[in-house]
Swiss-Prot record:
Protein's name in the database: Chlorophyllide reductase subunit Z
Positions of the UniProt region annotated as Disordered: 460-487
The organism of origin for this protein: Rubrivivax gelatinosus (strain NBRC 100245 / IL144)
Enzyme class, first EC level, given as a word: oxidoreductase
PANTHER family, sorted: LIGHT-INDEPENDENT PROTOCHLOROPHYLLIDE REDUCTASE SUBUNIT B
Family listed: Belongs to the ChlB/BchB/BchZ family.
Superkingdom as given in the UniProt entry: Bacteria
Coiled-coil parts of chain: none
Catalyses which reaction(s): 3-deacetyl-3-vinylbacteriochlorophyllide a + 2 oxidized [2Fe-2S]-[ferredoxin] + ADP + phosphate = chlorophyllide a + 2 reduced [2Fe-2S]-[ferredoxin] + ATP + H2O + H(+); bacteriochlorophyllide a + 2 oxidized [2Fe-2S]-[ferredoxin] + ADP + phosphate = 3-acetyl-3-devinylchlorophyllide a + 2 reduced [2Fe-2S]-[ferredoxin] + ATP + H2O + H(+); 3-deacetyl-3-(1-hydroxyethyl)bacteriochlorophyllide a + 2 oxidized [2Fe-2S]-[ferredoxin] + ADP + phosphate = 3-devinyl-3-(1-hydroxyethyl)chlorophyllide a + 2 reduced [2Fe-2S]-[ferredoxin] + ATP + H2O + H(+)
Length: 487
């Protein structure tokens, strides 16, 4: 399949983002000169706001000699000479180094090797393996059983690991802050956030948790399975979060109901207020679409469509190990254009191609990488109760934007041609032209169908009159809509 507009990176990026997220581990990239500039310097500046050279990375800087004749071992020794000999190090290979058998660790060094398989695996598949690799290399060989709750000292809180936060993950700080808030809200404590913020010396402490929360569907589950503890998927949506808290409370021997009740009157209150406000008239007809990683695509669609009843035009999930058919995504955006589109820079481009036409300008809400968008502040969650409120709030703001784009500017009204006076009757329409008009209006959100119909009808009659045509034909209407004539 020919893939346009890639929506994820190769495995080498996933390994780098996981290994650099954990403290105490030096990373050697075995690749050509400058191979770290894109993933570790440029992209992380536009996604995680990291300054250049923030991460503990050394590059072998392969040249023509190494690639064509000498191999990578000599370059590896040079890279090793600038490392701190007292700290562990891991070498990851880019696709070029993999093709020539690179990544071989020189004898007498403490560098360990991790093979990203960047030719075969994508960013999420490799991140999944990299997290497990950290545990398999620096964790415990035998996992002890946790002490039963009734045998623990009074007042000792149960513990939870949050698995998944790493670099290059959309909206991670806000979602992490919300999951931490939920865990602590029902009376538990966060044992470790892994790998981001953890130290290599503390990897063994992952077994000190009673439950693991896997933040993402794309990666992290391999480690959760290896830790031999119950694990839950981080929730998106109001009812999903309630179910998550109740199951977490059951596993931790805690009562989550007091916290849930407080949340209804605090964090969740804006949802009720928005639901009962003037925007309630639009909720049943304002459609949306989403193209994002599987975590967000599944969660946001379930929340907005199943829990709230908003009409969904399409939901496309980007899954680990599967290539997204972006050509069909582009077609969906063009033919089933929603009033609100959640997506990445790719979908924003496809949406920009549909700017001509009538009715409102669709609103775009970032929900995925790729794209240059920094979310270091913790006030934009999609997960948990705070995420449910944020999503409804942003959806309402998108509706206001749509209304803004429907209303004409006064300066535009002053610039248009005067409205020609009508004869006794309007210009007649062919039956086929009427059908094209009806089909077009039916595809518009109910919110703007009357406006769209009037705009198209007036323009078709005006241009037909200017061309000296006695009737409005289907060809004239299709021309205005940018549609091709049927074969």
């Amino acid at each position: 399949m020919y893939v346009i507009d890639h929506d994820r990176a190769g495995g080498y990026w996933g390994a780098v983002y996981v290994f650099t997220a954990i403290k105490g581990l030096q990373v050697v990239i075995d690749g050509p000169v400058g191979c770290e500039n894109l993933p570790a310097t440029a992209v992380l500046h536009y996604t995680d706001a990291l300054p250049p050279h923030e991460l503990p990375i050394v590059v072998t800087g392969l040249g023509e000699e190494e690639l064509g004749r000498e191999g990578t071992e000599g370059a590896m020794k040079r890279a090793h000479s600038v490392l701190d000999p007292d700290l562990p190090a891991v070498v990851v290979t880019g696709s070029i180094a993999e093709m020539i058998g690179g990544g071989v660790t020189p004898e007498g060094t403490t560098i360990q090797r991790f093979l990203p398989r960047t030719i075969d695996e994508d960013q999420w598949q490799c991140a999944n393996r990299a997290m497990f690799w950290l545990w398999s290399e620096y964790g415990l060989r035998k996992i002890p059983q946790r002490t039963p709750f009734e045998q623990r000292p009074a007042g000792e809180k149960p513990r939870v690991n949050i698995i998944g936060p790493s670099y290059g993950t959309f909206n991670m700080p806000s979602d992490l802050a919300e999951i931490r808030r939920l865990v602590e809200g029902i009376g538990a404590e966060v044992n470790m956030v892994f790998p981001l913020g953890s130290h290599l010396a503390d990897v063994q402490k992952l077994v000190d948790a009673d439950v693991n929360v896997c933040m993402y569907r794309e990666f992290g589950r391999m480690l959760c399975e290896a830790l031999e503890r119950p694990y839950l998927q981080a929730p998106i949506g109001m009812h999903s979060t309630t179910a998550f808290l109740r199951e977490l409370g059951r596993l931790l021997n805690l009562d989550p109901e007091p916290f849930i009740e407080r949340e209804k009157h605090t964090t969740l209150k804006p949802i009720w207020d928005l639901w009962r406000s003037v925007t309630q008239d639009f909720f049943g007809t304002a459609n949306f679409g989403i193209v994002a990683g599987e975590t967000y695509a599944r969660g946001v669609r379930h929340f907005l469509e199943d829990e709230l009843g908003l009409p969904c035009n399409f939901a496309v999930a980007r899954k680990a190990g599967e290539k997204t058919d972006n050509e069909s995504v582009r077609e969906l955006v063009h033919t089933k254009t929603p009033l609100v589109l959640f997506g990445s820079y790719n979908e924003r481009m496809y949406l920009a191609e549909t700017t001509s036409g009538h009715g409102p300008k669709p609103a775009y809400i970032p929900a995925s990488f790729p794209g240059a968008i920094i979310r270091r502040h913790t006030g934009t969650p999609f997960m948990g109760y705070a995420g449910a409120t944020y999503l409804v709030q942003e959806f309402c703001n998108a509706l206001f934007d749509a209304l803004f784009n429907i209303l004409p500017l006064g300066t535009e009204l002053d610039r248009i041609d005067a409205t020609p006076s009508r004869r006794g009757d309007s210009r007649p329409w062919d039956d086929e032209a009427q059908q094209v008009l009806r089909d077009y209006v039916a595809r518009q959100p109910v919110l703007v169908q009357i406006s769209a119909a009037k705009q198209l009808r007036d323009r078709a009659e005006r241009e037909a009159g200017a061309a000296g045509e006695e009737r409005v034909t289907a060809s004239r209407v299709r021309q205005l809509l940018g549609q091709k004539e049927p074969a």
